[in-house]
């Protein structure tokens, strides 16, 4: 609130409350102009909204970002099916757990809104829902991921999704050029998006190694 900014101003000589433009708004109707924001951030948005509201909220963030702007996020995800009782548990909703999506569904929600590049920057253990404390017959394992969704144009062949894959060329030449914009220097890992990994693997070469997804992409990749 504005009151908190005033307190910060009193305690820090360098800070001025007018450094911050504080606006009252709604995630599904942001009081912000189109194409005006460089970076937007959210935490646990995916886990408190129902699917229709979530779709609208993501579309709103895509609307306000400038071209190539970034939506930076951290959310719980779950690769297991949750029963309806867990999904509708208000306690779990308050804990930002009941709406946990699989990573594939999470990414799809972002690309459906028009984000052309997705970077999964971290994936970590987060919580367990166990039968003793929750209405479930099995252990439910929940992870936390950190993602940047970038407002790049959507490529004709689909979004560029970086999950931490890399390709390493170890052939006889100094480098390998696939003729599609990807040059692999000999014995040097090149971070690649999942789409490019699939295209290179389809070449059937026996002198390129492909790593599995680390889900810790840190930039410098090629799509």
Report residues per predicted region.
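A short acidic, Gly/Pro-enriched loop at the edge of an enzyme's catalytic core
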Residues: 28-40
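Short alpha-helix
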Residues: 98-120
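Short, glycine-/aromatic-enriched active-site segment of Class I SAM-dependent methyltransferases
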Residues: 77-97
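C-terminal lobe and adjacent flexible extensions of AdoMet/dcAdoMet transferase-like proteins
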Residues: 113-125, 129-223
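Short "lid" loop at the C-terminus of a central beta-strand within the Rossmann-like core
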Residues: 45-46, 76-81, 122-127
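A short glycine-rich, Lys/Arg-flanked "PGG" loop and its adjoining helix->strand segment in the class I
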Residues: 55-70
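Class I SAM-dependent methyltransferase SAM/SAH-binding core
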Residues: 1-30
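Class I S-adenosylmethionine-dependent transferase superfamily signal
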Residues: 44, 60-62, 110
């Amino acid at each position: 609130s504005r009151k908190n900014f005033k307190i910060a101003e009193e305690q820090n000589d360098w800070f001025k409350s007018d450094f911050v433009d504080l606006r009252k708004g709604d995630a599904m109707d942001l009081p912000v102009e189109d194409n005006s924001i460089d970076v937007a951030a959210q935490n646990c948005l995916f886990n408190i909204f129902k699917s229709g509201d979530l779709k609208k909220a993501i579309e709103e963030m895509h609307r306000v970002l400038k071209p190539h702007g970034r939506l930076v996020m951290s959310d719980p995800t779950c690769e297991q099916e949750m029963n309806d009782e867990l999904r509708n548990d208000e306690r779990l909703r308050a804990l930002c757990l009941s709406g946990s999506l699989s990573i594939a569904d999470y990414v799809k929600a972002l690309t459906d809104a028009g984000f052309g590049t997705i970077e999964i920057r971290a994936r970590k253990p987060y919580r367990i829902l166990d039968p003793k404390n929750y209405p479930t017959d099995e252990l439910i394992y929940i992870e936390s991921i950190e993602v940047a969704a970038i407002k790049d144009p959507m490529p004709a062949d689909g979004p560029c999704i970086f999950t931490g894959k890399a390709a390493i060329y170890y052939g006889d030449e100094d480098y390998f050029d696939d003729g599609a914009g990807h040059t692999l220097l000999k014995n040097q890992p090149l971070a690649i998006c999942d789409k490019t990994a699939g295209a290179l693997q389809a070449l059937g070469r026996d002198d390129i190694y492909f790593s599995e997804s680390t889900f810790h992409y840190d930039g410098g990749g090629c799509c």
